[in-house]
Amino acid sequence: MYIGEKIKPQKGKILNNLKKLKPSFSTYVIVLDFREKQIEIYHNIIFINICKTQKSNRFIIIGIAANKQEAFRLVRDIVQDIYKVGVGLDFSRLSGLEVK
């Protein structure tokens, strides 16, 4: 999982809140969307609302960030790591927090 520098001290609390679908106001999540087959960035409140209304296992959280700028940096890091390893966008090789 990719964790932004500004959010590292609160990592445990934020991940627990996400598992419980409980919002944190200044957090962005980076997710794999299996239906759309792409990486997406959501403010966590919007993401939680999507999870509650759709009730599907279409997302895996692969990163959390303190703000949108940090989320963009993490996505850049993810893409660079994917191409270093040479897996393309093979979602099965990325791990994260499954949202149910």
Description of each model-found segment:
Residues P23-F59:
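Short aromatic-glycine-(Arg/Gly/Cys) micro-motifs in beta-strand/loop hairpins
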Residues K19-S26, V99:
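A broad, low-specificity signal for short, low-complexity segments enriched in glycine/proline
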Residues M1-K19:
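Negatively charged, low-complexity tracts enriched in Asp/Glu with abundant Ser/Thr
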Residues K20, V31-R35, R73-Q80, S92-R93:
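A general structural signal for short secondary-structure boundary/capping elements
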Residues Y83-K100:
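Charge-dense polyanion-binding interfaces
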Residues N17, I41-F47, I78-D81:
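Short, solvent-exposed coil/turn linker segments
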Residues S56-I61, A66-D81:
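A short, charged, amphipathic alpha-helix used as a generic interaction element across diverse proteins
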